[in-house]
Each structure stands twice: as C-alpha cells, then as structure tokens.
C-alpha cells in the first residue's frame, strides 16, 4: 500500500516538475581571449584568441538561484615573440552558482561564481616542451537572458576563468603559465 501511494505521489508530481521549467540549455559561440601571465616572466609568450562553440546546462534551485555547467573545448596556438611554439587543446568544464535578478521579466540579468577543472590534451609543442595535464581555478560570470519566445532566450555572457599550468622543457620547469581567459559569449537558450 505504501509503495502504491508513493508511486501515485511521484506520478502526480511529474506535471508540476515539468511546468516548473527548472532547466535551461544554451548553445553559444564563445570568443576566448587569454590574459596570459607567466612567473617567472617570459617576455613575448602568448596564447591565441579563439572562437569555439559551447553548450551549457542550468538547473534552477529557486527562481533566483541556478547552477550552470559549462562545456566547451578549444585549440590554441602558443607563440613566443610571434614565432609558433605549437598548439594545445584545453577542456575547462566550469560549474557556477548564479543569482538571477528579477526572474520574471523579459530581461533577466545574472551574476555567478564557481570553479573550473581544466585538462590539457593534444599538446603539440616544440620538442621538449610540455604542460601539466590539469588545473583547478575560479570563475566569475555576468550575463543576461532576453526572452524572444515563452521559453526561448537570446543570451549574452562574459566570464573570467583562471587556468594555470606549468611549462616544462625536458622535465625542468620553465614558468607557471596563467592563461586566465575572458570568455565572451552569445547564444540561444531554451528553458524546459
């Protein structure tokens, strides 16, 4: 009997959960603009700006508070004094907690803060050069969702993500490399 009542209660809750529209999925185009820092300083070391597609999912815990998981990957060229040292990919999944101001009007601004875990792969640098394969760092964001349909939104977003790794030559550490990009995004979101 208890199992039957539980099953009926769960089934009855499904329409409420669906109507609540607790999820949002966005697809964005990102411009990743590294803010390169080295320590000790390596003059002229740079990481290229790149565009990439991104998908993210936001779960709304309350109408004002959401948790967003950002998924994107990018291939960057690393240069020294304008000369190519090679290329590397990084995958920085980022989880942020967001506060959405005025969650009911057409224009819905938000701010967020969180963490990222970055893994480097397909590292193809000059002979002997390597980078660490992982990095943990913080993330800040601000953005706005602009309603264009009942559940569809144009999204503008900016993030600052802290990504650090070590550059090594033959196993000897040369410098700490902070890629630390500012990430500009524009896209479309659907709330469901």
Locations of regions flagged by a protein language model:
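Hydrophobic membrane-targeting alpha-helices
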Residues: 13-17, 100, 148
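Cleavable N-terminal export/targeting peptides
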Residues: 1-22
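Predominantly the C-terminal beta-signal and adjacent terminal strand-loop region
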Residues: 76-80, 87, 149-192
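Gram-negative (and chloroplast) outer-membrane scaffold detector with strong preference
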Residues: 21-22, 56-125, 135, 146, ...
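Short, conserved structural micro-motifs that define repeat-unit consensus positions
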Residues: 26-28, 56-60, 141-147, 153-155
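Outer-membrane beta-barrel and related beta-rich outer-membrane complex signature
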Residues: 37-39, 81-83, 123-125, 167-170
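Transmembrane beta-strand segments of Gram-negative outer membrane beta-barrel proteins
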Residues: 20-33
